[in-house]
Structure formats: C-alpha cells, structure tokens
Amino acid sequence: MKGSELRQRFLDYFARQGHAVVPSSSLIPADNPTLLFTVAGMVQFNDVFLGRESRPYSRAVSSQKCLRISGKQNDLENVGPSPRHHTFFEMLGNFSFGDYFKKDAIRFAWEFLTQEIGLDPKRMWVSIYEGDEQIPADEEAHDLWLAYMPAERILRFDAKDNLWSAGDVGPRGPCSEIHYYIGDDPDNQVPEGVNSEDDTYMEIWNLVFMQYNRDENGVLTLLPKPSIDTGMSLERLAIVKQGVFRSYETDLFTPIIHTVMELLGTGSDHYQANSSAYHVVADHSRSIAFMIADGLRPGNEGRSYVLRRLVRRAAYFGQTIGFKAPFLAETIATVIDMMGAAYPELRSKQAYIAEVVTGEEERFNKTLAGGLRQLEAMLPNQADKAVFSGADAFKLYDTYGFPLDLTERIVAERGLTVDLAGYEAELEAQRARGRGAAQFKKGAVTERWAERNLAPTSFTGYNELESWGHVLALEFDGEELGTVQRGQEVAFVLDRTPCYAESGGQMGDSGVLVGPHGTIVIDDVQKPVPGVFVHRGKVSKGSVSLGEQVTVTVDAARRRDIVRNHTATHLLHRALRDTLGDHAEQKGSLVAPERLRFDFNNQKGLSSEQLQQIEDQVNAWIRADSKVEAAEMALPQARELGAMALFGEKYGDVVRVVTVGCGNASDHIHTNSEAPVCSRELCGGVHVARTGEIGFFKIVSEGSVASGVRRIEAVTGRAAAEWVSQQAQLIRTLGDKLGAQPGKVEEKLDALLLDQKARRDEIERLRGEIAAGQVDSLLAQKIEQAGTPLVVARVEASDADSFRRLGEQLRDKIGSGVVILGTVIDGKPLLLAAATADQVKAGRHAGNLVKALAAKVGGGGGGRADFAQAGGRDAAALDQALAEANGLL
C-alpha cells in the first residue's frame, strides 16, 4: 500500500468517525517562540488543549508536517546511516478535546490498524504506564486492550516510555504505545524485544491520555475534560505496510533515490556502496522543499540557518557521490511530484523553491573549494592534537559558510574532534558584535542611547523640509565622540530636526546635514528611545562636532513620494471598510517612497470586482481633491469624533488625528462629480495637504500573509505612472506578437483560445474514434484460455489515463472475460489487468495477475480483483512478460 494511500486512509477513517479533517499547520509554529519548528501534530492544537482557544469541533484528525532538527529532538546526525531517522516526517494524529477518551481511542487505533489497513494482530504489542507514587498504573487502558489482545502482549513500562507531560506544570497523563514486529519469523517474538535495542520491534503509534493537571506545588488533579493526543509516523507505517526494513526502501523515498541515480547515471551497486549519502540527499530534499514553501530562506540566524545547513549538507553529500553542479532542484521536483497533491503549497511555489535552493547551492559551491583548501591548510597546525581548534572551525563557518556539522564530519575522517566550547565562544562574540551593529534595525532599543538621558527631539518636519538644530550626540562604531570625520558612518542626535523617524509603518527620511565645517549624508532616522530621533549617515565632507549649529534638509522628492503613499493608505483603509465591512481593520503597513503595503483583517481573498471597486473609490477621492488636516486633541475627544486607533498601538493622553475630508462641501473641490471622503485616524505621520496631490492610485497585488489577514500592495504618483506605462508597453508588445492593435489584443486572444479549444475537442474526438477502433481490433484477438475469454496485447498509449480508459472499455465490451494489456510510457513499462464481474466470481483476480507480471518487468503493484495496474523499470522485458500471461490463467 502506497504511502499516499496510507495517509488518505487514515484521514478518511477518522473522518467517518466524526473527526474534522484539519490541514497541516506550517512547519513554523504560530505564536510559539519556544519551538523552532513544528515537531508534533498536537502543536497547532496546543491552545485548544490548554483551554485558551475554542474550535468548532471537539475531535480532529490531521497529517502534520514535522521537522526535528534542533534541541532534544534532533535527528540530523542520525540521518543517512540510520535506516529510520529523518529530519522531516509526517505525523498522523487523531485528537479529542474533551470528547471521547481511552475506550474510543484504543478502539479507533485497533480498527484502523487491523481492519482498515490489514496489519497482523499477532505481530502487535502494546505498552501501558506501570504507575508511580503519584499516578497509578493505567489499569483502565490494560483492561480495554484485553478486548483486543492477550494479556501477555500488554506490557508495562515506567515514565520514560509511557508518561507524557507538557512540562513541570500543566497537563499530563499516561500513554499507550503500539509496537509492531517486522522480523521474518513471528514465532521468534519475545516481550523483551519491545523498547529494546532490537529494531525488529518498532513503535508505530503513541496514544496519549491527558487526564491530569499538575499545579505549581506539584499537586495532581484530574482534568474536568480529559483529552486524547495521538501520533503515528507515516514513514514508519509505510515500513510496516510495505514489508521493508528501512524507510528509505518505501515509496516515500525510493522515487527521490531513483532521481539521484538517474541524474548521476549510476546503478544499484553505486547506491549500495554510498547509501548514506543518497539517504541524506533524499531526506534533506523533503525538508528543504517544505521549509522554503513555508516561507523560509537560507540565512545565518535561527530557522534560516537551519535551512542553510540542510541545503549545504545535502549539496556536500551530493558532491561526495559525483554531483558537480547544483542538483537539488531536480530531487525537490520529485518530492513535489510525490507530495504536491497532499500539500498544494509545494506546487504553487515550485519555481520559487527551485530558485532559492539553486541560488544557495551556487553560493556554497563557490566557497566550498576555497573552504576545503583553507581547512587543509589548518590541519597541519593540529599536528599531534586530538582536537580541531574551535576558532578555526568558526572561521570556516564565518568566512566560507561551512556548517559546523560539515567541519566535524571532515575532520573526523582525520581522527579529530572539534573544540565545541571554543566554537561557541567565537560565535557568541560575533553575536555580541552583531547586536551592536544592529542598533538601527526597526524596533531596536539600544541601552546606551537610553543611558544618555537625551532630551526629546523637536520634530519640525510637519511644516518644513529644512531647519536648523544643534548637535547633541555623535557616535561612531558604538562609541560616543566629540567630533566625527570624513568617511565615517555615524549616528547623531539633534535638538530639532525636519527628518521624520521611522514609526507607524512610515519609513524614516533621508537628507543632508550641513555644518560649519562638514557635511553628513543622512540615510535613515530611527527612534531607539521614545522621543529621541537618531539619524544615521556618512560624513561626506570635513568634520562635524558636538554643539555645532547645523542645517538639515530633507530629500524633498523622496518625502513627496512617501506622503502620497501615506495618505493613500488612509484612503485605502476607508475604502476597504466601506466595501468589506468594519472588520477590515488595519493590521500593519509599510509606507515607502516607491510603494505602500497594507495588511488588514479579512478571511478570504478579494475578488477582481472588489479590488476594482476599491481602486475606483480611492481614485474618486483623489480626484475630489479633499482637504487633509491634522490636529492634536485629547484621546477621549478623538474617540468621540470616531477616529480609528490602530492594531494595538499605545497612545498618550494627547493624540494627533489626521482627517481627510469630513467637512463642508467646500472642503472638496470637485463635489459635483465625486462622493466626498471622510476618514479620521490617529496618526503621527506626514501627509499631503489635499488628496489631489496623490495623483493616481493603482493596486498591484493582493494576497494572504496569515490566517485571516490579507495584504494589498499599491503604488501612487510617479510610481503609479511608471507602472501604467510598463503595462501599456506590455500590451503593445503582445499586440505586435499577435498581429493586433493594442485595443484588439483581448479580442485576438479570445479568438486564439476558442481556436485552441476547438482543436483540443477535435483531438479528443479523434482519440475517441481511434480508441473505439482499437477496442474492436483488440477484441478480434480474443482467445480462450482455460475456459476464460482472454485478450492479451501490447498497445500504444499517450499517457496513463488513456491506457486505463482503454482497459476499462475493453472490459466493458468483452462481456465476459479477462483483459491484460501492456504499454511503455516515457520509457517505463505499465501493465493492467481487468476482469468482468462473472470472472471475479469464478476466482479470477486482476490484482494477482498484475502483481505476477509486474515482477517480470522489475516492478511491483496490485489492486482490486476487477481492475489493477502496475509499473516497472525494465521496458525491454515487457513483451516477454505479456507472452507469459496466458500461463497465469
């Protein structure tokens, strides 16, 4: 049974038992900073179990994407040599939130394993909790299991194996593990094999019975609504059901391994000699595909660094078996072919995944050769030592991008180990330096700025783009100086400035400072301490000193682009609420000079009609040239006016309210033709004086950023004009290619599509006629074999679907008999067998016929008694296999 079928059968079985089928959550846990990655199916239900969240269902089932590659649950080093360890795996799980408990959980598990997928009960063992001074032995589970298996197969273990807890405080409970014997001879089973080093006894399913709660004082109480959390590895279940010993021999991995062999042009001997490297590539290809699909990119911190390690580790092992150029996009394409139906995000992001992983491989390949040379140069310095320098290991990582585990592997081949303490010391020193360099990142609050107790900066930029001020602080490379010189990248604070500091989504200004002896080009302005505007820039001329009076001028063109976009976000917000409802509140924004980005609450994507309506409304308000005003007032007064406060922002007693329109008709110049706008928001940003200054508003994209949160990106002013010009040029180019005037491009495309459809319909009609003729021709070849009408033939088929349809048509038209067909598609042999109902009753079995024939072409398969298909690897053996088909009856 294929892995994909096992997954679907699991979901379908529990759906029939009243469980809501819940899609897998992301590998990146939502709102859980304690977890680097999702490691179990229950992670997405954690708040439900803890009573913090309610769902519209009380029982659920899922197939959860999981990654175990860090901390205690780190399988990375075992991946490759181990037959069953993986970084990525799928956890099948069923869950009860105060609904059913042990009786049904055990019944469901037994029914699924023995009845739904046909596992042998005589190979099954279960474990229960033996109890301790606080939690008694789980006699309830023991007695429930007795209904399904003899007492000698119900084993008792301690807390290490059979007690689950969420931590020192919180829910906990006994668990019951289901183990399966995969050895050759079931008569050799002994109880001592369970939870031992004997890997012919394999745990496949863990049923957790959450029935207690432990408080801060260590006191245990029964939960008012006990719950169920179960987990079963699809990879392990495939081992059991497919009758193999290693997960890499299941169909969850063999297609990836075959892709590697095809790319290298190698055979089974090469694979057997280098199986660990093949397994690393196969395992990591799955992890990499899902990590990128879930939004990660390779980097040097946190989750991004884990992804970089995996890509580079896979690339390195690939090179050890013969790859010279990037190859992971090809193995990942196989992963997507296999898993894209179950996880559509893989297919939708396939091109992006390939681009990201290939780029990272190329970067690694550029540094690998130099890194290896550097490592070789370092090794003589380690003479007569058993430990490789941690400082050198860090240099390989920092300069050449060598992950630590890669260095460990290479030096281990020379009999050395890495000084991990020294490596960590170097890494922490770099992080400390990085924290100092990161002072201008958004939201960064540097302790040294707070300690200086600087007076709040007076912002003059609401009314002017140039003003004078005095230098209060100067900083270079983290140190406070009295004077900064040409060429230095500096930070400085003035007592007053026209430059806006980044906040509320609006980017900081750029500009120039001119003093009596020097000039600083300003790149950015931030507020690391409330009220203190820290400017960042480079001294381009002379020097600047503390106390000097200077003149600061804002980049006017950039500021105009920013204010257009900022006022446009207010208009967009108003239009969204008017179109979608008041729930469409702002969740975040970016106001940059070249574009605006606006995140808002909405459960589903917007239709083309809705987007056009919103865009038209905003442009109507722009054409109305309504007045934009700002006023400071008490917070209660602002609320009385209906001013919107945004996404949990904290406000003082006095707030700034930006109002667009909302006044008399005279506030809107074009009141005869346009509906006036009325928008009031609490906002500290800078804006246009009238909406007409925005010029033009154009939505360029709409999509999802999180559950229930949508994002619109748009352009205004100069950027909008450029966008429209680019689109017009695109239409002209398409017109040239289609031989049509720009205004006729749509008409020409419609005509081409209609013609294409007509041709496809004609092709399908002709295929139908050919198939009908082929059916009649094949029926004419019918023979009698052992009293059974039989058609055996090799046929031509364009694809697997047409091959299957031909077999079904023959079976339906033969009346009574058996059909056996073979074909070759893309160089691979395919076989099918079909039997009419009366022949099935007479004992004919299409699945058995196909299984026997598939073995002759180097494949396997089977299926139902009335219809079955199988594939193989040896197309040259197909004719001989068909020639021997008669003898199978």
Curated annotation (Swiss-Prot):
Q: Where in the cell is it found?
A: Cytoplasm
Question: Where does this chain mainly localize?
Answer: cytoplasm
Gene Ontology cellular-component terms listed: cytosol
Co-factor note (free text): Binds 1 zinc ion per subunit.
Annotated SUPFAM superfamilies: Class II aaRS and biotin synthetases, Putative anticodon-binding domain of alanyl-tRNA synthetase (AlaRS), ThrRS/AlaRS common domain, Translation proteins
Classify the source by domain of life. Answer: Bacteria
Co-factor requirement = Zn(2+)
Q: EC number(s) in its UniProt entry?
A: 6.1.1.7
Q: Which GO terms describe its molecular function?
A: alanine-tRNA ligase activity; aminoacyl-tRNA deacylase activity; ATP binding; tRNA binding; zinc ion binding
**Cross-referenced HAMAP family, in alphabetical order?**
Ala_tRNA_synth_B
Q: What is this protein called?
A: Alanine--tRNA ligase
